[in-house]
Amino acid sequence: MRKSTDFIANIDICKEYDARYAADEVHYETFAGLAAFFGRDMQVHWHDCFFQVHFLETGKIELQLDDQHYSVQAPLFILTPPSVPHAFFTEPDSDGHVLTVRQELIWPLLERLYPGSNLALDMPGICLSLADAPQELTALSHYWALIRREFGQNLAGREQTLALLAQAVFTLLLRNTALEDNANSGVRGELQLFQRFNKMVDERFREHLPVP
């Protein structure tokens, strides 16, 4: 199902691409797998309530990330926080991995990595080449293999293992990014307020009694 805010599609991959995983906190698919379903010319869209990582091992991407344009050769990663609009185009030789994670798993991670900052809600979108980071590429190769295995099998502790692996991938990628609290946010004002409201509800709802 796609919702629209000012004609920007909100794509919920867990429901629209594969409804079997609609309730999952972590969703994994190859880049080529999603491209076969959605196409390689992705018009501007966003993912409400989800952080997403696109990691390209091969090919090149033309990316519009909020108001910034990128033309980057693999290996690279793109990290899009909830509600950050983005669009991209790739050729058939572009492939890699896509990790979609519910914001409730990433918010605490950002608060631990950047204590006292507002990055949990104000984080900009990121596009970064990893061509000069061979150690990170080796580590990520192991993580992707583990994530793909866990996601594709119904093993004991699957949900917890996927959550930990997803947080590890985000941590590794963020270590290679110079994020500052005063960085320009890619989140539009009204969507940022909506995110703040959602986060407050998520943190406080257990403190209140249900309405009869």
Pin down the residues of each PLM region:
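Generic protein-terminus/edge-of-domain signal
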Residues: M1-Q64, Q68-Y70
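A hydrophobic/aromatic-rich effector-binding and dimerization subdomain
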Residues: R2-E25, F89-G152, R175
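Amphipathic, well-ordered alpha-helical segments in soluble domains
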Residues: Q52-F55, E136-Y143, L165, V169-L172
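Conserved hydrophobic/aromatic beta-strand scaffold that supports enzyme active sites
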Residues: V53, F77-L79, V98-T100
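Structural motif
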Residues: K60-E62, H69, P85, D95, ...
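Short beta-strand His + acidic residue motifs that chelate non-heme Fe in jelly-roll/DSBH
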Residues: E62-Q64, T80, H86-E91, H97-V98
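Short acidic-glycine-tyrosine-enriched beta hairpin
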Residues: D67-P81
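Short, Lys/Arg-enriched, Trp-marked, Pro/Gly-tolerant hinge/linker segments that flank
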Residues: A131-P134, F151-L162, L173-V211
